[in-house]
């Protein structure tokens, strides 16, 4: 999950926790990675022409997601895009977004009708939570006229004007991870901290 505090609220994050709890009851244990996206996202808005900021934002999200996936040993990424539903979900847009990763991208909802997607959400009891009116980091920075058919060469040119590597590293370092069991309980909070403490302990023991 990508959040951009203070532009996104604590209620918006709680909504994600509530959705994760519901999903864990359906699919079992879930690991939730919360990415603090504020600094990188605000720089995208400053540096990229407004009608291309949505495309660029999605591209950077995918870059971050790919790094997390590699750390976790995942072989693919999965998104909830449905073709034609919003500006960022056209074939042209997906082509531009896909370009930043070599990982397979699974889109199980791609050709599903909105009515069918809503039915699934009702069945697994996530629809009501999803409809809560808390803005996410995509909606708060939505441009007035997002490009529905972006051109790859243009977005590559816009992003190549600046070096984002330091911002990407900072964003990756900001990630907090939570593990939910099949009953929706948090069984490990901020795994990154626990892992670092364990590594510190191991390093110290080597000195004994």
Language-model-derived ranges and their functions:
Residues 1-123:
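ATP-dependent adenylation/nucleotidyltransferase module used to activate substrates
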Residues 30, 74, 90, 94-103, ...:
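Peripheral terminal appendages
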């Amino acid at each position: 999950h990508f959040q951009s505090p203070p532009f996104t609220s604590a209620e918006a994050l709680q909504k994600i926790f509530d959705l994760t709890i519901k999903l864990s009851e359906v699919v079992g244990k879930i690991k939730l990675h919360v990415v603090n996206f504020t600094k990188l996202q605000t720089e995208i808005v400053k540096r990229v022409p407004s009608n291309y900021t949505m495309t660029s934002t999605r591209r950077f999200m995918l870059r971050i997601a790919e790094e997390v996936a590699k750390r976790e040993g995942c072989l693919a990424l999965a998104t909830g895009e449905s073709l034609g539903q919003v500006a960022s979900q056209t074939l042209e847009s997906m082509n531009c977004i896909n370009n930043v990763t070599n990982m397979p991208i699974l889109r199980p909802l791609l050709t599903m009708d909105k009515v069918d997607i809503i039915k699934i959400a009702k069945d697994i009891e996530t629809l009501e939570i999803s409809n809560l009116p808390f803005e996410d980091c995509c909606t708060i920075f939505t441009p007035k006229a997002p490009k529905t058919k972006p051109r790859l060469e243009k977005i590559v040119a816009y992003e190549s004007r600046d070096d984002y590597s330091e911002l990407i590293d900072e964003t990756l370092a900001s990630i907090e991870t939570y593990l939910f069991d099949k009953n929706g309980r948090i069984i490990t909070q901020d795994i990154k901290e626990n892992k670092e403490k364990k590594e510190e302990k191991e390093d110290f023991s080597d000195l004994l």
